[in-house]
């Protein structure tokens, strides 16, 4: 059952709401415009608030639904977390879009919401505070994601290895943003 759910989570994660909504509304492909990222922040830049919110909600659900299904099927918390990681990997490397996806932050937040809501709340609060202070989405993601690890280590240690793996993937996907942050070239809102 684990492997079936993991594959289905990857396939669900491969649905890129940013790309699909852009195509449906005649907006530019977010991978080719703005920051080049197929995610909610770039959709805000390219297509406005409404499509950005729809992208955010779709990406959150891609992480949340597989975890909830795995939980309902009685899988262990660690298996639920790995299935959530598969959904995020689908978002990062979508089968349907030549393996060029987003950075996985919203999908990871959905996964966390399903696994351990207090960790998701911590991540969202850290993201919002960092974004409010810096107006930089990438920095907010790079701060919020690792902040969940100590809480998970303390409260839900079974989710720590999958979440640590996920954190490394998200930081890796932000490597260009890290270069730009250190060089003082990162885009602000």
Curated annotation (Swiss-Prot):
The UniProt record lists the keyword Transmembrane: yes
Protein's cellular compartments: Cell inner membrane
GO CC term (a single one): plasma membrane
Membrane spanning stretches: 1-21, 51-71, 77-97, 111-131, 151-171
Alphabetical list of InterPro entries matching this protein: G3P_acylTferase_PlsY (IPR003811)
Main location group: membrane
Record's catalysed reaction(s): an acyl phosphate + sn-glycerol 3-phosphate = a 1-acyl-sn-glycero-3-phosphate + phosphate
Leading EC class: transferase
GO biological processes: phospholipid biosynthetic process
UniProt pathway: Lipid metabolism; phospholipid metabolism
Topological relation to the membrane, as annotated: Multi-pass membrane protein
The enzyme's E.C. designation: 2.3.1.275
Gene Ontology MF term list: acyl-phosphate glycerol-3-phosphate acyltransferase activity
Keywords from the UniProt entry: Cell inner membrane, Cell membrane, Lipid biosynthesis, Lipid metabolism, Membrane, Phospholipid biosynthesis, Phospholipid metabolism, Transferase, Transmembrane, Transmembrane helix
Recorded superkingdom: Bacteria
Family, similarity comment: Belongs to the PlsY family.
Described function: Catalyzes the transfer of an acyl group from acyl-phosphate (acyl-PO(4)) to glycerol-3-phosphate (G3P) to form lysophosphatidic acid (LPA). This enzyme utilizes acyl-phosphate as fatty acyl donor, but not acyl-CoA or acyl-ACP.
Subunit-structure text: Probably interacts with PlsX.
Name of this protein: Glycerol-3-phosphate acyltransferase
């Amino acid at each position: 059952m684990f492997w079936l759910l993991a594959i289905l989570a990857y396939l669900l994660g491969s649905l890129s709401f940013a790309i699909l909504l852009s195509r449906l509304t005649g907006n530019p492909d977010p991978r080719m415009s703005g920051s080049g990222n197929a995610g909610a922040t770039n959709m805000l830049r390219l297509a406005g608030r409404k499509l950005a919110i729809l992208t955010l909600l779709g990406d959150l659900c891609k992480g949340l639904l597989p975890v909830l299904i795995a939980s309902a099927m009685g899988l262990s918390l660690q298996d639920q977390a790995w299935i959530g990681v598969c959904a995020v990997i689908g978002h990062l490397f979508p089968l349907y879009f030549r393996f060029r996806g987003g950075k996985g932050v919203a999908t990871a937040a959905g996964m966390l919401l399903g696994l351990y809501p207090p960790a998701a709340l911590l991540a969202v609060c850290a993201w919002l505070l960092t974004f409010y202070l810096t107006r930089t989405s990438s920095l907010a993601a790079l701060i919020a994601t690792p902040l969940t690890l100590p809480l998970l280590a303390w409260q839900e240690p079974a989710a720590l290895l999958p979440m640590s793996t996920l954190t490394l993937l998200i930081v890796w996907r932000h490597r260009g943003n890290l270069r730009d942050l250190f060089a003082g070239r990162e885009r602000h809102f």
